[in-house]
A protein has these predicted regions:
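C-terminal regulatory/effector modules of DNA-binding transcriptional regulators
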Residues: 49-51, 56-202
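Long amphipathic alpha-helical segments
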Residues: 1-74
């Protein structure tokens, strides 16, 4: 994003993102534009072309934009209900929040537990809230084998009818390693399409 370069005004990023939402709609923003922006910012940060403070500034601007979008959506209690979080040690939550907004636009009832939720807490929430899908978002910063162990433990602990979804660039390192019962989605669009299918059978 050009507006993250040197001399960027504090409000410029937020204003730019809000204009994109107004022009394209919230669904297109979270399913198409936001993933591309997140990848570009992550790569720029990893290569040293973007300072930590600007990466944090971008993250907060996105959060505020998504919070604003969520606040405008009508609350839903419809099934299938989706619980969204990240594994312990995974602080990056933009992917999870983007999925939450994308599903909420479709009318889904989403429960966000924020980031870094232990297995036992996810399971407890899923059971008590009658959750149909648990969705885990993972960035490239998450050690692959730690992520795999977390997903396997979740699958073993969740009630069999509860589906377990996983997505984000952190899953790329686990290609072919995910056991049966864990659905890997490579894009927000795929997850939204899967939720729509569940909607018709719930």
């Amino acid at each position: 994003m050009v507006c993250l370069g040197s001399g960027c005004e504090p409000r410029a990023v937020g204003d730019y993102l809000e204009r994109l939402v107004d022009l394209n709609g919230l669904a297109v923003f979270v399913q198409t534009l936001l993933p591309a922006f997140n990848d570009a910012v992550g790569e720029a940060w990893a290569s040293g072309r973007l300072g930590v403070h600007m990466e944090h500034h971008y993250t907060e601007a996105v959060r505020q934009t998504l919070y604003t979008g969520l606040a405008k959506l009508r609350a839903s209690n419809a099934k299938p209900r989706v619980l969204i979080t990240t594994s312990p040690g995974e602080l990056h939550g933009l992917g999870a929040m983007g999925l939450q907004v994308a599903l909420a636009v479709q009318g889904a009832h989403c429960v966000s537990l924020g980031t870094q939720t232990p297995v036992e807490e996810v399971v407890s929430a899923a059971v008590s809230m009658d959750i149909c899908v648990v969705a885990i978002s993972a960035s490239v910063n998450q050690p692959p084998q730690e992520l795999l162990a977390y997903l396997v433990a979740l699958r073993k602990s969740l009630p069999p009818p509860c589906r377990l979804w996983a997505g984000g660039r952190g899953l790329l390192a686990l290609d072919g390693q995910l056991p049966q019962g864990i659905d890997h989605f490579q894009s927000v669009e795929e997850a939204v399409a899967a939720w729509r299918l569940l909607l018709h059978v719930s």
